Design a protein with these regions (language model features):
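Conserved short beta-strand edge segments in small beta-sheet-based binding/regulatory domains
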Residues: 36-38, 83-98
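Short S/T/G/P-rich N-terminal loop/turn motif that feeds into the first structured element of a domain
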Residues: 1-75, 97-101
């Protein structure tokens, strides 16, 4: 069953370039695991109509053919070599898993 991952990403101030380096590695590896980046949004202040949480730096919407494909992506050896970039740049994130209704 196709799954969708929405991620709200909050980065450490001043670490934008480090985050971009991690994304340059992580995003292409999605394809290896039957996934697809559907949206990558860096919202501006005017993008929000209403908010009751901290505004994220980026929002990603990704689809994978299955839960197993997502798990395989998370354990990708090449991606794991660069997790230190993620740790250096991302303060926190919120991951939401769902399916198409």
């Amino acid at each position: 069953m196709m799954i969708f991952i929405t991620q709200l990403i909050y980065i450490i101030e001043g670490k934008e370039k480090v985050f971009d380096r991690f994304e340059a590695i992580a995003i292409p590896s999605i394809l290896k695991y039957h996934g697809r980046l559907l949206l990558r949004v860096r919202p501006t202040e005017n993008s929000f109509i209403e908010t009751n949480i901290e505004k994220p730096y980026e929002i990603h919407l990704i689809e994978f053919n299955s839960e197993q494909d997502f798990e395989n992506f998370k354990h990708d050896e090449e991606r794991k070599k660069f997790l230190y970039l993620k740790d250096q740049s991302i303060r926190t994130s919120i991951l939401i898993k769902g399916t198409k209704l």
